[in-house]
């Protein structure tokens, strides 16, 4: 839900910064979502203009091209984190497995470069074995499990338990999205 003062549907970096200043928030993390489209060009500009205020995650085309090449290119553009909406990698006609050879090579590249992975996982344990393999193979890769483990979906508790591993964290930024019908203070969250 957008605040009423955003009349054109665009929450630009400048509008967001004004709200951050008003709320006395020093910095923010921007994680992309596939439903909004890949926004690397805009976020690269935001990162350049407001590097001290925003940490931005890049995103790539998961269904086309080499994950390694795309992440190398994003790293070259200054992105130090990659967002993967894992729950959107499972389609009726195709699927990208997190532990496929191409994806594992990409995760190892991210680990070597000191990048951060922000990932949302599918419900019902569909990707748990895959992400556990990533965690085991890339123990130095910093991983943020998104949307508090997709707390409104079955199997979220197992996602939270992943934080028992070194360098695996849980972020709660998606609470406002998952509980958007309630509005602040999100009583059932």
Question: What is each residue range found by the language model?
Answer:
Residues 1-105, 109-113, 153, 162:
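Mid-domain alpha/beta scaffold segments of enzyme catalytic cores
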Residues 81, 96-189:
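Catalytic pocket-lining loop regions of alpha/beta-barrel enzymes
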């Amino acid at each position: 839900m957008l605040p009423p003062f955003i009349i054109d549907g665009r929450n630009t970096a400048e509008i967001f910064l004004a709200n951050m200043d008003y709320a006395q928030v020093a910095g923010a993390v921007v994680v992309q979502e596939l439903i909004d489209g890949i926004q690397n060009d805009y976020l690269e500009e935001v990162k350049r203009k407001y590097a001290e205020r925003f940490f931005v995650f890049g995103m790539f085309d998961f269904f086309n091209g080499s994950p390694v090449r795309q992440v190398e290119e994003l790293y070259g553009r200054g992105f130090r984190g990659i967002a993967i909406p894992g729950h959107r990698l499972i389609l009726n006609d195709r699927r990208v497995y997190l532990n496929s050879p191409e994806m594992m090579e990409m995760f190892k590249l991210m680990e070597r470069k000191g990048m951060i992975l922000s990932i949302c996982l599918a419900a019902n344990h569909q990707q748990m074995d895959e992400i556990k393999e990533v965690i085991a193979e890339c123990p130095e890769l910093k991983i943020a499990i998104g949307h508090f483990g997709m707390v409104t979906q079955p199997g979220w508790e197992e996602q939270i338990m992943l934080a028992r591993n070194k360098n695996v964290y849980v972020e709660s930024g998606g609470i406002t999205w998952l509980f958007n019908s309630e509005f602040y203070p999100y009583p059932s969250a």
